[in-house]
C-alpha cells in the first residue's frame, strides 16, 4: 500500500523487514520452517524489487549492505537436512528414520529433500543477487544520470565483484 501511495522509502523498509522475518524463520528449524521462511523472504524481496525506483543513493547503499548480511544468514540445505533429521530422531526415534527409508525406498531418505532445498536455496540467493545488482544500477543511474551497460560497469564502484549465478556459476547479467 505504501508503494502505491508514493511512499517507496517506507515500502522498501517494510519489504526488507518482511524478507528479514522470512530468513529468521528458516534459522535452525526443520523443513517446514525453511519452506515457510523462504516463501516469506521471497515475498518481501519481490516487493522490495518493485520499490527500488523510488530510492535515493544512500538508501540503495544501505539496503545493499543489509541484503549482503541477510543473505549470509540464510541456512544452507545441509543445515536444514541436519535439523530435519534431528527433529525426526527426537520425535520418532530410530523408527522414524527407518520409516523414511521405507517410504522413499532408499537408504538415503534425505537426498531428494536436500536436492529440493538446494533448488529453493539457489532461487532465493539469485533473488538476493538480482536485488543487489538492481540497487547498484539504481545508484549508478542516480549518480551518473546514465543507464549501466552491464554488471561489469558497476564494478568496483557499486559492486565488489561480478556476482555468479548460484546454480550455474556463470556471471549474472542486469535483470530486466
Model regions and ranges:
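Short acidic linear motifs
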Residues: 1-176
Amino acid at each position: 500500500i505504501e508503494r502505491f501511495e508514493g511512499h517507496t522509502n517506507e515500502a522498501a523498509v517494510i519489504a526488507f523487514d518482511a524478507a528479514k522475518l522470512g530468513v529468521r524463520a528458516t534459522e535452525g528449524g526443520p523443513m517446514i520452517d525453511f519452506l515457510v521462511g523462504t516463501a516469506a523472504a521471497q515475498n518481501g524481496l519481490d516487493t522490495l524489487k518493485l520499490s527500488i525506483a523510488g530510492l535515493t543513493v544512500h538508501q540503495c547503499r544501505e539496503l545493499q549492505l543489509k541484503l549482503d548480511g541477510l543473505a549470509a544468514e540464510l541456512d544452507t540445505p545441509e543445515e536444514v537436512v541436519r535439523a530435519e533429521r534431528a527433529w525426526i530422531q527426537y520425535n520418532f526415534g530410530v523408527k522414524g528414520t527407518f520409516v523414511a527409508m521405507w517410504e522413499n525406498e532408499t537408504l538415503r531418505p534425505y537426498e531428494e529433500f536436500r536436492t529440493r532445498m538446494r533448488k529453493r536455496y539457489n532461487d532465493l540467493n539469485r533473488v538476493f543477487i538480482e536485488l543487489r545488482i538492481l540497487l547498484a544500477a539504481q545508484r549508478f543511474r542516480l549518480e551518473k544520470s546514465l543507464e549501466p551497460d552491464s554488471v561489469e560497469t558497476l564494478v568496483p564502484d557499486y559492486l565488489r565483484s561480478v556476482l555468479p549465478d548460484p546454480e550455474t556459476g556463470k556471471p549474472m547479467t542486469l535483470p530486466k
